[in-house]
Curated annotation (Swiss-Prot):
The gene is nadA. This is Quinolinate synthase. Keywords: 4Fe-4S, Cytoplasm, Iron, Iron-sulfur, Metal-binding, Pyridine nucleotide biosynthesis, Transferase. It catalyses: iminosuccinate + dihydroxyacetone phosphate = quinolinate + phosphate + 2 H2O + H(+). Its main location: cytoplasm. It is found in: Cytoplasm.
Length: 394
């Protein structure tokens, strides 16, 4: 279990990384933690200067990580940018930094805490910055799933593979049961490794990345995959369906990438003749199949860097990154548009804004530790084991 700690507040940890407003939640609070009363106003004209001053005062004691999906107002203060795993490794490579300020979401901060030393303190500027996909698989649900696999007589044949976008509890379960973690960049290698260890894979929490990797990269058929729904008895599957399947996909998805549809692809091709469609593998299978290129955020960035002048691109990933890339490459005569007509931000990622970052940096500069993300030792040990298996992948 993970605790989020604020020295000045006596709060109880919540079981999920994100307590959605509307589910018996107080709109004046964030995941059971009172909103800081001295949070700066978004209209404060001195926010940039305040953030810069606090960061300079902290010096080498602080290391700010910025995920690709963050707002520009936050990214400008990041010491490094990248995807979740790259940032966690970047944090581990800076042992002199006492504070790791992770401008991302909860599971990312957990991963950074797992990979950094016990002396380092990982901080999340807004505790409500969770991940709906990571929250789609709880430890209790996954344990129940394993019981279902055991009753079907196949648990010993199953190797769990968990996406980096999962909670520390799920990573720990994966490590404890002989599995590995994967990213969107190395999912193919992770699955190949898993099938060398066992006959079947339980892939969680993102069904789309699992399906796309199995079918597109490993040459499986859609019939080789079944979807386990944690909200239905026995996952909505019969014992025979489980025994016949090679890939058991958890019924989870990214709310951002799940919005893209085949209509989105067809529409942009009609509007922009000659456009290259480049999407993230968290998109639905039919979208990935219709795209010209598929890859992680790092792949998307590198593909656009290498693209020739005059080329046209429709990108299926989070809007903050797409806008940033469009602005960056406009001078090189590369036309870059968002794949869908509908604006599609990651709402929880966008909870990290400049006021929260300023409040965090100023609090740390004043000697007050806020919003610490800390994974307990047992969970950390098994989660780290799963991460180390990933690092050792051929």
């Amino acid at each position: 279990m993970t605790t989020a700690q604020t020295q000045e507040l006596d709060v109880q940890p919540t079981p999920l990384a994100l307590l959605l407003l509307g589910r018996e939640a107080d709109p004046r609070s964030e995941r059971g933690v009172e909103c800081p009363g001295d949070l700066p106003s978004p209209s404060d004209p001195d926010l940039v200067a305040r953030a810069r001053a606090a960061k300079e005062k902290l010096g080498d004691k602080v290391f700010v990580l910025g995920h690709h999906y963050q707002r520009d107002e936050v990214i400008q203060f990041a010491d490094v940018t990248g995807d979740s795993f790259k940032l966690a490794r970047d944090a581990a490579a800076r042992p002199e930094a006492e504070y790791i300020v992770f401008c991302g979401v909860h599971f990312m901060a957990e991963s950074a805490d797992i990979l950094t030393s016990n002396d380092q303190k990982v901080v999340l500027p807004d505790l409500a910055a969770g991940c709906s996909m990571a929250d789609m698989a709880t430890a209790e649900q996954v344990a129940e799933c394993w019981d279902v696999l055991t009753e079907a007589g196949i648990a010993e044949q199953v190797v769990p593979v968990s996406y980096m976008n999962s909670s520390a509890d799920i990573k720990a379960f994966t490590g404890k049961h002989g599995g590995t973690i994967c990213t969107s960049s190395n999912a193919e290698r992770a699955l190949n490794w898993a099938f060398e260890q066992g006959e079947k894979v339980l892939f969680l929490p993102d069904q789309h990345l699992g399906r796309n990797t199995a079918v597109r990269d490993l040459g499986m058929s859609l019939e080789d995959c079944v979807v386990y729904n944690p909200h239905r008895p026995n996952g909505g599957l019969t014992a025979k369906e489980l025994r016949d399947a090679n890939m058991i996909l958890w019924r989870g998805h990214c709310s951002v990438h799940g919005r893209f549809s085949l209509d989105s692809v067809n529409d942009v091709r009609e509007r922009i003749p000659g456009v290259n469609v480049l999407v993230h593998p968290e998109c639905k299978h039919e979208v990935v199949a219709a795209a010209d290129y598929v890859g992680s955020t790092e792949y998307i960035i590198k593909a656009l860097e290498a693209a020739p002048a005059g080329s046209k691109w429709a990108i299926g990933t989070e809007l903050n990154l797409v806008r940033r890339l469009a602005n960056r490459f406009a001078a090189e005569d590369k036309e870059i548009v968002f794949l869908d007509k509908t604006v599609c931000f990651c709402s929880t990622m966008n909870r990290i804004d400049l006021p929260h970052l300023v409040w965090t940096l100023e609090s740390l500069a004043e000697g007050t530790l806020v919003n610490r993300i800390e994974v307990d030792q047992e969970t950390e040990a098994f989660a780290k084991l799963a991460l180390e298996r990933m690092l050792a992948l051929p």
